[in-house]
């Protein structure tokens, strides 16, 4: 998988479920999401034995590992079969990763510029709910070529997701509101 394919898949999916629950809960929620064609998911390094879960789910899903904070986590994620990496920030080993796509985190235009100058064209804006939709629109004016995924405190209602995408985000990451995502998805079908 390359970055363009990942962005395309996430743009189509519109929402990236971010899991922090234990393995059994993650699998239960994924079973509930199956009818809604969720293909791309993020598992965070805070899940106990996350490497085993990545290995297990990477046969059925495009699995990213999130909350990456170190070079050793990058190596562990790749060894487990992760197809992309996500972080709430950025550091040299992450933005220099070439084997699989990365979505480093940023909060300011300067951080986005640093990420872009390193050759990365996709970033996670966190915490987006604090910064707001107008902020995303303003960032897109400055750097229209950057693909921005928003996460952090965003409700997963259809209207909320639509408005973040209209502001310039290509995808909305939902973590604690993943159960609301299920409810919103069930209302659409």
Regions found by a protein language model. Give the residues of each.
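Conserved N-terminal beta1-alpha1 strand-loop-helix module at the mouth
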Residues: 1-84, 100, 154-158, 166-167, ...
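Conserved anion-binding
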Residues: 49, 69-74, 78-176
